[in-house]
Amino acid sequence: NVCYQGDCLEVMKDIPDNSIDCIITSPPYNKGYWSKNRNMNNGFKTKCRRITYGNFDDNLTPEEYKKQQIKLLEECLRVLKDTGSIFYNHIDILSEHQTIHPKFVYNFPIKQIIIWNRKNTPKLDKSYFFPITEYIYWIQKTKTSRTKFNRKKAIFNSNVWNISPATKNCFPAPFPEQLVENCLLTTTDENDIVLDPFAGSGTTGVACKNLNRNFI
């Protein structure tokens, strides 16, 4: 078990090919760019609340962000074992007129899209239905990737996971431990190596410790 502080794309260069059993991560959503009702080319404005990070302003141009995330996912596939899985969490950005969807993810071999129902209390807004869901893109490297569903737990019978966000956490957008544990129980064994390139508040590491997995 080890933690690194640095640019994940730089740190991952030192991780050997085909060495990671599972990758679970949620990147910054580039809300720094889309926040403050930024005007779009069609004259409409985005509706997005900025997330504040300690050492990253989360403010790339859409093209820069797309290139960054594609490079990240390419690196994830490089370090992932043929039997491994990636769980990549992302969201839609809303505007007054259209939804900005992370289409770049579809360049990769998605096995399934899991819907994370955060169960937030809806806020009133006159222009759209308040979003309470996020996407978890389950990406598998090959057809030989491991999958082991625990049929005793109803959560694994559906691609909609009803999990409330973590609350006792100072980080702006923390994973709930249950979400990470669902991914681990479905695709890993004890002592497997799990990578979270962004790490955030360290929830992936905590879940790995709870289930006797090794983490980076």
Residue positions per predicted region:
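Core catalytic lobe of class I
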Residues: 1-216
